[in-house]
Amino acid sequence: MKYSKVHTCDFADERDVESGKEFKVCDFEGIQLGIMICYDREYPESARILMLKGAEVILVPNDCGSMQARIRALSTRAYENMVAVAMANPNGDSAGCSCAYSSICWDRNGKCVDNTVLLADDKTEGIFYAEFDMEAIREYRNREMLGNTFRKVEADSQLLSKEIKKPFIRDGQNR
């Protein structure tokens, strides 16, 4: 699969890079994989679109700060879209914290379960492995109520507006 980052950073060296136009999903050995590169993960819609396109696992290559809010957001993307999420990040100050989250957030008895599969610290350099039970994830997606189950698409139309309103207008925005 060839994929270009959709949400480039207008405030950094990426300002002059042409952004991708769509999110893509591919089949890899029977698993539907989607990709969100770095800043793409800042937008919940990125994961939602990948879920709508059939992604079961979303890979997130990342090379920027991994503050706890960003780490928690990936757990939330896994939960709300019923997809597994795995992020790889270099180690070091304001980085590190490669992580993986399962979409499974409660068991068959309705008891909440921790969906953390892997959470590395920000100092250790290495290769980390996260294993997802795809059979369990697929069974979970077939029985639970999140993802696209009860979504009211007509209420989401404002997400398609290109208008940027105060206080979010910035000098030099590439639009």
Go through the PLM ranges and name each one.
Residues 7-8, 16-20, 80-83, 108-114, ...:
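Short amphipathic alpha-helical surface micro-motifs
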Residues 1-53, 62, 68-76, 100, ...:
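Active-site catalytic loop in hydrolytic enzyme cores
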